[in-house]
Amino acid sequence: MRRWRWKMPATSTLAADVTQTVTAHVAGRVAQAFPRCRALILTGSAARQEATIARRPECVYWLSDLEFLVVVSDSENVGLTGEVLDELAATIGKDLRSQGLHIKLELTPAPERYFARIRPHLFGYELKRCGRQVFGDVNYLDRIPSFDWRSIPLDEAFRLVSNRLIELLELRLEQDRRSLAEQFYAVTKTYLDLLTALSLPAGSYAPGYQARFGARRAVLQWAVEQGCSLPASFLGNLEIAFQFKLDPDSRFHFLWVNGQQDLPAALEREGLRCFWDELPEAALAVWRWFASRLAGRSESCQEDPPHVYPVWARLRGWSRLLLHADPIPRLPLAARAVRLFPHGSPRSLVYSCGARLADPHAGAKEDSLAWVSRFLPLPTPNRHADWRELAEACVSIWRRHLRHSHA
């Protein structure tokens, strides 16, 4: 195959030019390496023209994920196909890095039937309105049912906030393996998605960070009036996050110092330490507010996990968890499912455990660790596990079973 050479765009519209060039390259590679692909669809921030791309002397850094849906036949084994596409994405990413573009590429298989079955949720809404089909004879985006964003259930916002909390745990576990810019982007994304989540019940949701940011003051005022206890610095931190999201080169040169992984120290030198320190408080305030609303009472403050999902969702969640579990631990996991079923679904329990562990003040205390050991859906929980062990287990379950699923 002809070796592809990366060329730096010379225009001021760096992100748009990089997105167009890389999308065309990925499309060619996927079509050649995976001929069973029936269509390729660009999703996420790149499709919304909101990719976070920084030009540095040594490299171009694509900090947000570059995400594609690879449409396959309904008869495909999605699990095996996913493994093949993961390898292909890694190969393409490695080739791009060798040409001066640091990027994380995701190729996710999507059976043809998937699109017609999409129900109202945030990803489906943005896919319908912002997704871009790169190639394919059938327009699969037209198959997505049309729905108003007001029909998106509140638990979608709760799911978004919960996923960002788990990613904060992931960041704390991997902090010494990520660059300053990668860490800062993870924090940035969390701030922006807290606004996304609140914009849904506030009646100001729109498919794009720029539109939601424009309504930020009204959304935050509404949230405070509704009892969501946000830190006083949240608005200022949100504005920092938005600036970095769309313009990571302007005032953030300190993030590109080689060999440094201590983001809190770097932020303190720049007078931005509260951007890091106050995020857990803000995220937990929003999480508890949504949990309370969904549970119908202030269960987030009680000993039992908040009951945010109905019984049918618990049944579906536990069934899928047991179905996809490894054979050896399946029996003890089934016994644990019986004990934990009254307390919630695997999703709600993982989210509740993640929220406990993410608390910077109480997360590592003995009673919090005991609580997480009690409710985390593991086959054989370790009653003496420390914070790191439990956080790693929580993140592992989320990655394997919950991250890309609604079950």
Model-derived regions: residue spans:
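N-terminal regions immediately upstream of nucleotidyltransferase
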Residues: 2-35
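Glycine- and acidic
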Residues: 6-12, 71, 175-177
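Conserved aromatic-histidine-acidic binding/catalytic patches
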Residues: 14, 18, 76, 80, ...
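Active-site nucleotide-donor binding segment shared across nucleotidyl transfer reactions
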Residues: 27-66, 71-77
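Residues at beta-strand starts and edge strands
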Residues: 64-66, 101-103, 186
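Conserved catalytic core of two-metal-ion nucleotidyltransferases
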Residues: 79-141, 160-167, 181
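Long, low-complexity intrinsically disordered regions
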Residues: 143-149
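Conserved nucleotidyltransferase catalytic core and NTase-mimicking acidic/glycine-rich helix/loop elements
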Residues: 149-407
